């Protein structure tokens, strides 16, 4: 970071303990490795027998090797603790990650809104062409004073002020279309109990 932040006392103490652990573990590895190298050196004169000295050197090398392994494991644990410390306390990085994710979601929402608007316009154009074809055909029995479905649709859309208003249900429009279709296919009543179609003079 370009600017060093002022840490609370507890965090400062924790970082100091991490630094001390790092130095102690590295020193332990270096000292034990140095002693292992010294033990490997063959000396000419011994106060004890050569077999006894060999067993002693073997035991010392095992102990110092175990110390090196233990210091290495402590360093790995220190790395894990440092990662956890950064994750839990590096708030600027966390906030930056959150802001980037929010920006990605906003971009995705804008793209979805544009696609929905384009889909709405395509549906409206197709609906207008279908209505023009239907009302100009000889099968239309609708009242000329009735509004076409496309005009009803656009009247509804003219009241929408945001992309969220695209969720207006089309059920009333479809119900009106089904009513018009039923008027075409419903035969006149011939039993005298219902009103038939008006005869043309």
From Swiss-Prot:
Coiled-coil region(s): 93-123
Keyword terms, alphabetized: Activator, Coiled coil, Nucleus, Transcription, Transcription regulation
The organism's place on the tree of life at top rank: Eukaryota
InterPro entries referenced in this protein's UniProt entry, alphabetically: Med22 (IPR009332)
Localization, UniProt: Nucleus
Key word RNA-binding present: no
UniProt subunit comment: Component of the Mediator complex.
Similarity field: Belongs to the Mediator complex subunit 22 family.
Name used for this protein in its record: Mediator of RNA polymerase II transcription subunit 22
Gene designation: med22
């Amino acid at each position: 970071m370009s600017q060093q932040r002022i840490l609370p006392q507890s965090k400062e103490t924790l970082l100091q303990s991490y630094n001390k652990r790092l130095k102690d573990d590295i020193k332990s590895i270096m000292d034990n490795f140095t002693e292992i190298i010294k033990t490997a050196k063959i000396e000419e004169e011994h106060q004890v027998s050569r077999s006894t000295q060999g067993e002693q050197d073997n035991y010392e090398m095992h102990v110092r090797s175990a110390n090196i392994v233990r210091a290495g494991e402590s360093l790995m644990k220190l790395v894990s603790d440092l990662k956890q410390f950064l994750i839990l306390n590096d708030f600027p990085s966390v906030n930056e990650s959150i802001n980037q994710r929010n920006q990605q979601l906003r971009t995705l929402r804008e793209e979805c809104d544009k696609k929905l608007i384009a889909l709405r316009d395509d549906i409206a154009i197709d609906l207008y062409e279908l209505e023009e074809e239907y009302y100009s055909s000889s099968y239309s029995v609708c009242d000329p004073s009735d509004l076409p479905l496309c005009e009803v649709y656009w009247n509804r859309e003219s009241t929408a002020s945001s992309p969220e208003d695209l969720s207006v249900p089309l059920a009333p429009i479809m119900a009106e279309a089904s009513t018009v279709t039923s008027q075409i296919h419903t035969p006149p009543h011939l039993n005298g109990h219902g009103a038939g179609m008006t005869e043309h003079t």
